[in-house]
Amino acid sequence: MIQPQTLLNVADNSGARELMCIRIIGASNRRYAHIGDVIVAVIKEAVPNMSLERSEVVRAVIVRTCKELKRDNGMIIRYDDNAAVVIDQEGNPKGTRVFGAIARELRHLNFTKIVSLAPEVL
């Protein structure tokens, strides 16, 4: 579960290393975000000489959470970290590579470009 002020790792090569959630896109007063939700975040740590810089406000989609994700078939998936992929206004990733495992639920939420870039889909 991701809430405002939560720090997340960045799972792509867009230039950002760490994000801090500042708002959850969706309903007017959502408290938590889960895998597949879009958030507004600020870049807390970035790689030098890249397109994204520190203190820049971006949109990101959550791809991994430490909180368990229960599927309809009873399977429970839990990751070791909270991670997100930086996206543009159309929902396309800003990076060209995605690192780490990605949940299958992103495919049903129309983030197929992120799923196709991922090395492993759980």
From Swiss-Prot:
Keywords from the UniProt entry: Chloroplast, Plastid, Ribonucleoprotein, Ribosomal protein, RNA-binding, rRNA-binding
Major localization listed first in the record, in broad terms: plastid
Signal peptide: none
UniProt GO cellular component terms: chloroplast; cytosolic large ribosomal subunit
Gene Ontology MF terms: large ribosomal subunit rRNA binding; structural constituent of ribosome
Role according to the record: Binds to 23S rRNA.
HAMAP family, alphabetized: Ribosomal_uL14
Subunit organization: Part of the 50S ribosomal subunit.
NCBIfam families the record matches: rplN_bact
Name of the molecule in the record: Large ribosomal subunit protein uL14c
Organism encoding this protein: Acorus calamus
Lineage: Eukaryota, Viridiplantae, Streptophyta, Embryophyta, Tracheophyta
